[in-house]
């Protein structure tokens, strides 16, 4: 799935409603070097686990460095964006409450 407002970012649903998941959905993001996700907000929280690469989590709370093994919590209604600042793809897992449109 590609996302409006993103550059070099791809999202793939790993576990969703189609798998019978009623409470949470698990998504995988890959952001190319120099790429970013949309700068956006939504009414639900989500949790991030960084798998590979390096980047910056841009948010109202201030910019945070992202590296493999880091975890990040994004509060509901918080403006946020993930930027790849490294030389290899930035990959992370994102958990969101279900049901939600996978592009949100």
Identify the meaning behind each predicted range.
Residues 28-32, 41-59, 95:
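Short, conserved beta-strand element in jelly-roll/cupin
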Residues 11-12, 27-42, 76:
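Conserved short histidine dyad/triad with adjacent acidic residue
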